[in-house]
């Protein structure tokens, strides 16, 4: 599990982009709730 799969990397990029746009910390799961 040390190396993320290609599909995981494809998901991480948009997720981090959204977090940056919404200005929410990625490490805080409570902020990811709708």
Curated annotation (Swiss-Prot):
Q: Does the keyword Zinc-finger apply?
A: no
Key word Ubl conjugation present: no
Question: Consequence of mutating residue 24 to N?
Answer: In HYPT4; uncertain significance; increases HR protein expression; abolishes the inhibitory effect on HR translation
BP term (GO), one: regulation of translation
Recorded superkingdom: Eukaryota
Q: What outcome follows a substitution of residue 28 to H?
A: In HYPT4; uncertain significance; increases HR protein expression; abolishes the inhibitory effect on HR translation
Alphabetic keyword roster: Disease variant, Hypotrichosis, Translation regulation
Give the record's disease field.
Hypotrichosis 4: An autosomal dominant condition characterized by reduced amount of hair, alopecia, little or no eyebrows, eyelashes or body hair, and coarse, wiry, twisted hair in early childhood.
**Function per UniProt:** May function as an inhibitory translational control element that can negatively regulate protein translation of HR gene.
Name the UniProt record assigns to this protein: Protein HRURF
In its UniProt entry, the species of origin is given as Homo sapiens
């Amino acid at each position: 599990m040390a190396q993320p799969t290609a599909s995981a990397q494809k998901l991480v990029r948009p997720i981090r982009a959204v977090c940056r746009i919404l200005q929410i910390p990625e490490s805080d799961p409570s902020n990811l709730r709708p």
